[in-house]
C-alpha cells in the first residue's frame, strides 16, 4: 500500500494529491464517527510511526508530474496520530511548491507536537460536528479519555496562533441537524476563514441530509463571509496515477 494516492477531486480543495501518513488496511483513528465511509477500525489516541519518512520520499517520486492544486494529508485514519507527521510535512514543503493541507478530526490539537506540526501547514481543515458532549459522543464516538471540553479548547488554542487558512468542517446528519444554531455560535468564537457544510454523500451507515435541509442549515451561517456546501461546490476533473490506491481509501472515482 502506497502512502501517496490520487489526485482526487475534492469539493473543498480542488485537485488534491493525498498523503496517507497512517496507510493501514484497517482504519486507525481516535474517533469512530457514525458516518465514516471506512467503517469500524482500531480506535486509539496513541501516536506512533506508521509510515517511515524514507517510504514517503520513495512514494512521492512515483507521482512526479501528477496534476494537483494541493497536497493533502488524509487517508485511512486520523493523520495526526502519525508521530513523524512534522517531518513529513517539512519534507513535502521542501520538494513541492504546492500548498499543503490536512483534514483532521481535531482530537489532538492539545498535543504540543501536533500543534507545532500543523502550524507549518498552509491549510488546516478541522472537524467540528457537535456543540456539546452528548452530541459529540453520539456522532464522533471518541476514544475513551477524549473529552469534549478539552477537544474544543484545543481547537480554540490552535486557532489563536495559526496564521494559515483555517477551515471548519461540519458534517450534518439527523443527530445534529437541529443544533446548527449552537454550532454557528461556536464558529463565531473560532473565527474560521471558511465554513464547510457537509453531509455524507459517500456510501456509509447513515443517510445524508437533503439539499433543502442543508440550505436551511446554511442560513444559520449567513454572517460568515466564506461558506461552502457539499451540494453547491464544483468538483474538478482528475486523472489519478493509480486508481487502486484511491479505491483503498474509498474515495470517489472520476
Residue ranges and their predicted role:
Residues 18-20, 37, 70-74, 101-103:
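Short, conserved beta-strand segments within well-ordered enzyme catalytic domains
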Residues 12-53:
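Canonical Radical SAM [4Fe-4S] cluster-binding loop centered on the CxxxCxxC motif
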Residues 46-53, 144-148, 207-214:
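Flexible, glycine- and charge-enriched loops at secondary-structure boundaries
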Residues 55-58, 87, 182, 216:
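Alpha-helical elements of Rossmann-like donor-binding domains used by nucleotide-donor carbohydrate transfer enzymes
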Residues 1-12, 176-254:
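Auxiliary Fe-S-binding modules of radical SAM enzymes
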Residues 35-41, 67-70, 130-135, 165:
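Short, basic/glycine-rich phosphate-binding loops at helix/coil junctions
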Residues 39-73:
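Conserved alpha-helical substructure of the radical SAM core
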Residues 80-209:
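Conserved AdoMet/S-adenosylmethionine-binding subsite of the radical SAM
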